[in-house]
Amino acid sequence: NNYEVGNFDVTAHTLSQKGDLPYMKTTRFQEALDFLPNIVTIKLGTNDSKPQNWQHRATFKDDLNLLIDKFQALASHPHIYLCLPIPSNRKEWGINDSIIVNGIIPYIREVAAERSLPVIDLHTAMLPYYPQLYVDGVHPDKYGAAIIAETLYKCITGEEPHPTPGRSDQTLWYDEPAAQWEETLPLGNGRLGMMPDGGIGKEHIVLNEISMWSGSEANYLNPDASKSLPEIRRLLFEGKNKEAQELMYTSFVPKKPEKGGTYGAFQMLGDLFLEHQYGVHEKDVPADYHRWLDLSKGIAYTTFSRGNVNYVREYVVSRDKDVMLIHLKANVPGSINFKMNLSRPERGSVRKLAEGKLELYGSLDSGSSQTDVRYAAIAGITCKGRQTNQSTDEQSITVQNADEAWIVVSAKTSFLAGEIYETEADRILNDALKSNLCETVSEAILSYQALFNRAGIRLPENEAVSHLTTDQRIERFQQQDDPSLAALYYNYGRYLLISSTRPGSLPPNLQGLWANEPGTPWNGDYHTNINVQMNHWPVEQANLSELYLPLVDLVKRLVPSGEESAKAFYGPQAKGWVLHMMTNVWNYTAPGEHPSWGATNTGGAWLCAHLWEHYLFSGDRNYLADIYPIMKGASEFFYSTMVREPKHGWLVTAPTSSPENAFYLPGKDRTPISVCMGPTMDIQLVRELYTNVIEASHILHTDTAYAEALQEAIGLLPPHQISKKGYLMEWLEDYEETDIHHRHVSHLYGLHPGNQISVLKTPELAEACRKTLNRRGDEGTGWSRAWKINFWARLGDGNRAYKLFRSLLYPAYTAQNPTQHGSGTFPNLFCSHPPFQMDGNWGGTSGISEMLLQSQDGFIHLLPALPESWKDGSFYGLKVRGGATVDLVWKDGKPVQATITGGWQNNLKMKWPKGVKKVLLNDTACRTDSFIPFTVKQGECITFIFE
């Protein structure tokens, strides 16, 4: 706007004339007057909250009026804006946000009202970014300063500032449109999702809805399966695993439904295409192209110029209005011209509903005589501009000469909405179109930030990468360090969780929420031999506890089917419920059709570990009482079906397999064998399940006799075994693996995510795990590398964990060969198996938090596996078991200050941090010991200072 801007701030000064450092007595204040401003923004009051200054609060309004009088007396007659101070807290400086909110801000508002001066609410503007965009709890960093500047600009000019990419650890950004789907940016509200490619001439936006599932409920129960069980077990007892496996292939498999497609698959919703026209600028070369995803707001942008026109596109999925929004605008009136259409590769039709409204509708193949899942996606357009022309035919909507346009899309399926899915989608769209869409975007940001801003991490920024796009940073990361890329990855993981699931919806599947085809890899289902569990590893520690609830609901729905599968496959004596290695929205619990991978029967036990984990963080006894019957039912299955193996008399699962892995029997036969009894992972899961059920029964004061029976059974389980070469054994016998670098490392479940093995409690087993991991190697699929990050973090080896993280971020393809995908990470930070699988992202997110904070062994462990290159950093809002929240600042690899906010468990302890000589708890020295016990009430904050 061609204004000269002057900043006449002086740090630590007060508005109060009686304060310790009065601003109006400084030379900077006189310089501000001499500047003869046309516009003045006054932001004072933060330092007036200090005790020595707040005692003079009776004169605060008088001093503010005096300051205003001095500016109004100037010959320039400036417009004056009063700013509300930003959120600030710093105990040792005496700065108190409670006084700012309840004392200083009301005074400023009173003066503004008395003098009819406008107020700029910087406190509200910065509150979502406190403390993550602050240097020290009082002073904002450069990104916080940018938000203040944007807020001032908007309030003074009445215009939205031109958006630009933000923080390097909260922004994915690119300087060209996406060339393939794995370069597009994911958005979602927990049910609806979209992925725009940012195309300039033709733009492709893939639409998603979490319940777009083909298939239907079906009977997979094989009535003859349990008849073969005694013979299968006899063969296993005699070491004839090959014969047992062959028998299972013919008998211990699910019954095939009459029509084979009932299992179904998660599918895309559809495609939205925009064909943009640029009029006289059609031949102008696009310039200043940027597209990015702002994790701090949950919004994506595309910006570029053509000729003298600057174009801005904004993409957001609103949770409150339950719609997808695309906002197109330009700085020159009448510059928005496009044609929009909807389509789907199969089983989709398009029709005009009304002027400015198109519907994509259809049904997904049930594979049976049951009703298909039906869906409706309805797009509506509203425009602004005096010369706007808008027309709708049966296939498209055309907009010409608009100043700005909003595309609003709603979608519903009969799976979640029932028979009213179509009318409900139309109602939601109409309600959204009637609303103030700018306010809808603001509401969407606040709704998202209510979750996202609970926690975050900061790691050292490298100025050398500030100008690099995200894909360039990924490539550079293999040769040169970039710690803030790990912070970006962690923040992105939390973003993906918030975007892909919410209470009342479905849990994220193998694709999370996002798919670009009707036939997703592995059906886009819920693999229960690690994948759906890995999806949820970071949820609790990332302070997103309620995002567990869709998984809890899924498990509840599986129980009746699991009870039927238990009796059909394991005999009438089988109690409780069972789940094998995969499931879907149709409650599939039977074994897989190939026993080599489908015989694993501990999927339910592993999911119960997550049910228990949610209790450990929440402490909700009503929740525990609700899920206890599920956990008990899972334990009853194993208690009633496990058998004594003949060699040691141990209780084992049989038949089963170690997930997807195989071995060779002794001798010359090189037939890969998967079917076995009592693999290490099964025993770890059963031991954990029994232990958790016992603990839950004690808490709930129920089933004492059954708990005692489980305790006795625990004593009959096989112990962990170490091979002659020092590895943790994967099977009861020290078999030779068919692939020593196999992607699954299932027998280390007890190290992570379980807690039966640790460096402190079981050092010999921990060392065996270390040797096992070295033998397995650091390569593997994307999600396998992610799991190994967690293993090494649990072993306390931060540098090795970080090495695995860098391996996880290996570029999935090169510019020279973009269609050949390998393991690693795509340009949009999606994990590549290959192909894309979302579990690797959340496994990596979990691994980063495990490097910074652990609590699985009954104590808080700060920086348990800190890499050398993360010497300085901070995190806030991370949760530990017991419900406490931890904020931490560290320098030179050692913690400096930790603030702990109490949860449901009051008595906690912390491991004495490595390299620390003295610890102060609320200014009182702690006794030097291996652990620091302390008490903190729920909601109470205590501070540790480390020296």
Segments predicted by a language model, with ranges:
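Active-site segments of SGNH/GDSL-like serine hydrolases
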Residues: 43-49, 69-103
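Solvent-exposed loop/turn segments at secondary-structure junctions
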Residues: 10-16, 46-51, 86-90, 125-128, ...
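Catalytic His-Asp segment of secreted/periplasmic serine-dependent ester chemistry enzymes
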Residues: 86-162
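Acidic/histidine-rich catalytic neighborhood
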Residues: 633, 637-696
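Conserved SGNH/GDSL esterase-like catalytic core that processes O-acyl groups on lipids
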Residues: 1-65, 91, 99
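Well-ordered alpha-helical segments within folded domains of soluble proteins
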Residues: 530-540, 601-612, 681-691, 746-755, ...
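Aromatic-residue-lined binding/catalytic grooves and analogous aromatic/hydrophobic interfacial grooves
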Residues: 163-595, 602, 613-615, 635, ...
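Non-catalytic carbohydrate-binding regions of carbohydrate-active enzymes
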Residues: 613-614, 618, 622, 634-644, ...
